[in-house]
C-alpha cells in the first residue's frame, strides 16, 4: 500500500547513498541529483525540507547538489524517473515493480517511509456500504496501489473487478472529478481522501487499515 511507500530518503545522506548506488558504473562520483515527489501525505516532508533549506543543508554537508521537484501527477513522476530525467522518485513498493521495473530501471529503496493505516480509501457518494460499489464506475489511478486496494475491497465481499468499471483518473484530477455529477466512486490517498471527505456526500466504505500488513 501507500504505506509500504518507498521514500528514497528524508536526509541528503541517505539520498546520496541511494543515488550513488544507481551510478556506481560512472568513472567519477556523481555530484548532482534530481529527486521527484508527488502529493501523498507520507511524501510531503520532501516539499517542506526543500522549501526550508533542509535538503540544501545536508547536501552541502556531503558536497553534493540535490534538486527536488514536485509533481501533481503520480504516474508522470514515475514516467519521468523511468525515462532517466530524475535520479530518485517517491513511490510505493508495489508501484516500483510496475512502471520503473517494466522500463528496465534497477531501483533501490532506501527506507520504508510510512505505513498506510487508512491513508488509502474507497469512497462512495451518498452510499455507506461497500456492497454499494457493485455496478458503479470507479475512478482511480489505473494499475497503481489504488487499483490493488479496489481489488482487495471487492474480494472481501466475494466480488471482483467484473462487477465495476474502472475509470483511469489522474490523482491531480481526483478531487475535481469527485465533485462532478458523473462520478460516484473513487479510490485515492491522503491528503486527497481528507479533501474529498469534506463533502458531506462522501463516505469511506473501505480503506487500507482493513488489509493486514
Segments the model singles out, each with a brief description of its role:
Residues 113-124, 203-213:
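Periplasmic-binding protein-like
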Residues 28-34, 56-70, 85, 134, ...:
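A local structural motif
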Residues 124-137:
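Flexible hinge/capping segments at coil-to-helix
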Residues 81-92, 103-107, 136-137, 179-188, ...:
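Alpha-to-beta junction loops
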Residues 36-39, 111-112, 135-145, 157, ...:
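Short beta-strand->loop
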Residues 9-20:
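Bacterial N-terminal signal peptides
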Residues 32, 39-70, 99-102, 148-155:
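Short, polar/charged alpha-helical segment
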Residues 95, 166-167, 172-213:
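Pocket-lining segment of extracytoplasmic ligand-binding domains
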Amino acid at each position: 500500500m501507500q504505506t509500504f511507500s518507498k521514500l528514497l530518503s528524508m536526509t541528503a545522506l541517505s539520498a546520496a547513498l541511494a543515488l550513488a548506488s544507481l551510478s556506481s558504473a560512472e568513472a567519477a562520483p556523481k555530484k548532482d541529483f534530481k529527486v521527484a515527489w508527488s502529493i501523498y501525505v507520507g511524501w510531503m516532508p520532501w516539499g517542506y525540507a526543500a522549501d526550508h533549506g533542509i535538503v540544501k543543508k545536508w547536501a552541502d554537508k556531503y558536497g553534493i547538489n540535490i534538486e527536488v521537484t514536485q509533481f501533481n501527477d503520480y504516474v508522470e513522476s514515475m514516467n519521468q524517473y523511468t525515462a532517466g530525467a530524475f535520479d530518485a522518485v517517491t513511490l510505493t513498493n508495489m508501484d516500483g515493480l510496475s512502471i520503473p521495473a517494466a522500463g528496465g530501471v534497477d531501483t533501490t529503496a532506501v527506507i520504508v517511509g510510512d505505513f498506510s493505516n487508512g491513508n488509502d480509501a474507497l469512497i462512495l457518494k451518498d452510499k455507506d456500504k461497500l456492497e454499494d460499489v457493485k455496478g458503479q464506475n470507479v475512478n482511480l489511478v489505473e494499475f497503481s496501489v489504488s487499483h490493488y486496494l479496489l481489488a482487495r475491497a471487492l474480494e472481501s465481499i466475494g466480488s471482483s473487478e467484473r462487477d465495476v468499471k474502472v475509470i483511469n483518473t489522474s490523482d491531480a484530477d481526483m478531487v475535481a472529478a469527485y465533485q462532478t455529477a458523473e462520478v460516484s466512486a473513487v479510490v485515492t490517498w491522503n491528503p486527497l481522501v481528507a479533501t474529498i471527505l469534506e463533502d458531506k456526500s462522501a463516505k469511506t466504505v473501505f480503506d487500507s487499515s482493513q488489509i493486514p500488513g
